[in-house]
Curated annotation (Swiss-Prot):
Key words of the record: Cell wall, Peptidoglycan-anchor, Phagocytosis, Secreted, Virulence
Tagged with keyword Isomerase: no
An example Gene Ontology biological process: phagocytosis
Function summary: This protein is one of the different antigenic serotypes of protein M. Protein M is closely associated with virulence of the bacterium and can render the organism resistant to phagocytosis.
Transmembrane segments: none
Name of the protein in its database record: M protein, serotype 32
Main location class: secreted
Annotated membrane topology: Peptidoglycan-anchor
Organism: Streptococcus thermophilus
Cellular component, GO annotation: extracellular region
Length: 14
């Protein structure tokens, strides 16, 4: 379950 990681990556990219 790396959904949080993916969301965090998106936020970090922003």
């Amino acid at each position: 379950n790396h959904q949080l990681t993916q969301e965090n990556e998106r936020l970090t990219q922003k």
